[in-house]
């Protein structure tokens, strides 16, 4: 069954529809790529925030604990013999 010739403006064998769908597909892919990049940026911001809020204070506390608990090494010349 063919489409009636009276309703055909340009006989392009579906090229306009094909181009329209390709452009729509390209626009959707571009929007998806932008959304994916924004999700990656959000993950990086959350990682940096977690590092700043959790990791660095814990590291400073651990370094302070290490320096507080550090003892001098045994030196036999300074030892007292009883």
From Swiss-Prot:
Residue spans, topological domain Intravirion: 41-82
GO biological process: disruption of cellular anatomical structure in another organism; viral budding from Golgi membrane
One Pfam family it belongs to: CoV_E
Entry membrane topology: Single-pass type III membrane protein
Any single Gene Ontology cellular-component annotation: membrane
Coiled-coil features, chain-numbered ranges: none
Residues that span the membrane, as ranges: 20-40
Residue intervals annotated with topology Virion surface: 1-19
KW Transmembrane helix (keyword) present: yes
Keyword NAD (UniProt): no
Keyword list, A-Z: Apoptosis, Host Golgi apparatus, Host membrane, Membrane, Transmembrane, Transmembrane helix
Leader sequence residues: none
Annotated compartments: Host Golgi apparatus membrane
Assigned protein family: Belongs to the alphacoronaviruses E protein family.
Function: Plays a central role in virus morphogenesis and assembly. Acts as a viroporin and self-assembles in host membranes forming pentameric protein-lipid pores that allow ion transport. Also plays a role in the induction of apoptosis.
Family matches, as HAMAP family: ALPHA_CORONA_E
Assembly description: Homopentamer. Interacts with membrane protein M in the budding compartment of the host cell, which is located between endoplasmic reticulum and the Golgi complex. Interacts with Nucleoprotein.
Protein name as it appears in the record: Envelope small membrane protein
Organism: Feline coronavirus (strain FIPV WSU-79/1146) (FCoV)
Gene it is expressed from: E
């Amino acid at each position: 069954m063919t489409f009636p010739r009276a309703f055909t403006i340009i006989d392009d064998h579906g090229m306009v529809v094909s181009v329209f769908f390709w452009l729509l597909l390209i626009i959707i892919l571009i929007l998806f790529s932008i959304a994916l990049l924004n999700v990656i940026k959000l993950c990086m911001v959350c990682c940096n925030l977690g590092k700043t809020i959790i990791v660095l204070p814990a590291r400073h506390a651990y370094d302070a604990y290490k320096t507080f608990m550090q003892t001098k090494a045994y030196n036999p010349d300074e030892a007292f013999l009883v």
